[in-house]
Amino acid sequence: MKSVAEKNQNRKLMSAQAGIESPLHIIDCGLAEYREVLQLQHQLREKRRRGEIPDTVLIVEHSPVITLGARQSANKLLASREDLAQKHIDVVDIRRGGGTTAHNPGQLVFYPILNLRQLNPCLPAGKVGISEYIRELESIGVELLEQLGVHAERQKGYPGLWVTNHQAPNEESSNAQNVTNKNNELNSSSVQPQRHTICDIRHTSKIASIGVRVSKFITYHGMAINIQNDLSIFEFITPCGLDGVEMTSALKETGKRCSISQVKEGLSQLLIRHFS
């Protein structure tokens, strides 16, 4: 079986496929095991640090896996590792920001390996702009989900993207008119992806997760967006250590399946625009 690195030797860069000349290299890893892609990230991170490669982004779907981040208090498994292994779900401890999350086919993950000093040359030494970088990832996710008909929002203090939960049409409520007005506001703003709303976590479902790490100004790890994956994998964890959080996907929100290859193409265009 070929490794991810060997597969990618013969895989064209997505920016080239789109006919775009860009200093950003975007590599489609297809469906790949998490541990293999993690090893590839480490290799590319060192090459980027030495200046041997340009800024690079890996786009991938993972086989079922649960990852635990560096924030131990946010790492909450609701099943034993033995039980998860029987269900063919790998569990990996990694050194990235955030807590527990899950990946599986139908979820689109992208890992930017970027030199933050070159991405933001005006920043003084020692100030790598991690907060600005995370906001940029969130902006990319918002714009991608807008293309799929999903209005995603930021939540201050909770990295990632969230979708507001609306009441069902037949549910009686004294504030039904307010909900209708809120829906109209969201619909009217959905064509303006540059306006990224801050939402209330108590009335939202999470659709995208972010966990990053920066070493010697080089980024790795990244963002996972639920497109049309099986959300039942999240029943085995407390996502990001937040009790009561519900997960959602573009499929759950719209009821429509999409072409993952087309979503990857749209993501590639956004990455080039934001990071080139």
What is each model feature region?
Residues K87, S205-I210:
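Short beta-strand or tight-loop elements
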